[in-house]
Regions:
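Short acidic (Asp/Glu) patches
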Residues: 69-71, 223-224, 228
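ATP-binding N-lobe of GHMP and related small-molecule kinases
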Residues: 2-157, 161, 165-182, 187, ...
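Single conserved hydrophobic/aromatic residue that forms the stacking wall/gate
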Residues: 225-237
Length: 237
């Protein structure tokens, strides 16, 4: 979608039904301002990009069974309406550039997807996600992205899993026609965190961020039951 078209849709209520599935009614107007600001900041960073895609991925909270995912236990948890949003423009430069609000921009070359020993930041997460997609046969040629998040780091609602879900959802939607399901998206995020970032996390955080809603998860056989309607990570436009 062209940037101006996106802005017009936000202003005229074209995305209100989508926003209503993500945010509380009283928050929709402030969220519109947040999305408009994100697009403006993206435009300032990448002025030559005019076709954009916009994504949202939620944080999560656990209700019961925290940490038992490591022992193949059962968890009740839910996605929250605090999320990370990403504005992306896809291209064929074989590089991923990401600028997150409050952090320096980083770049990941798609010609070098090996683990970088000692590099444990967001760049390694993105490198691991891209590597896993390539292992699965998905051809990626690059994108530029600006992200802003109210899933605060260190707040206990999985800012890293939300970021992983955002990146994997963007890649899957554009380069793979949304063919990878929510469970596989979660596994890709866990793979990047385990083998590239170096954190031996379980799968609960990524699963809840990816499948959305209020959910019962059985990690013995990796099954799930939605207790409420899911609010999946989504492509806004």
């Amino acid at each position: 979608m062209k940037i101006q078209d996106f802005q017009d849709n936000v202003t005229c209520g074209g995305f209100d039904n989508i926003f209503a599935n993500i945010y509380k009614p009283q928050d929709i107007e402030s969220q519109k301002s947040r999305y408009m600001s994100a697009v403006e900041k993206f435009t300032a960073l990448y002025p030559n990009r005019n076709d954009i895609h916009v994504y949202s991925a939620p944080g999560r909270t656990e209700i019961g069974g925290n940490h038992t995912d490591h022992q193949h236990g059962c968890v009740i948890a839910g996605a929250v309406d605090l999320d990370v949003i990403g504005v992306a423009a896809f291209h064929h430069e074989n590089i991923i550039r990401i600028k997150s609000e409050g952090y320096d921009e980083f770049a990941v070359s798609l010609d070098d997807l090996d683990v970088h020993i000692g590099e444990k930041g967001s760049s390694e997460i993105v490198r691991g996600i891209a590597a896993r997609f390539k292992d699965l046969g998905v051809e990626i040629s690059g994108f530029d992205m600006y992200t802003t998040s109210n899933v605060l780091a260190g707040s206990g609602i999985s800012s890293s899993a939300a970021f992983e879900t955002l990146i994997a959802t963007a890649i899957d939607s554009y380069y793979n026609n949304n063919q990878i399901g929510a469970v596989e998206i979660a596994k890709i995020g866990q793979y990047a965190e385990n083998f590239y970032f170096g954190k031996k996390s379980g799968l609960m955080d990524q699963m809840v961020c990816s499948v959305g809603g209020f959910v019962f998860l059985d990690f013995q056989n990796l099954s799930l039951i939605h207790i409420s309607e899911p609010t999946r990570p989504r492509l806004i436009s």
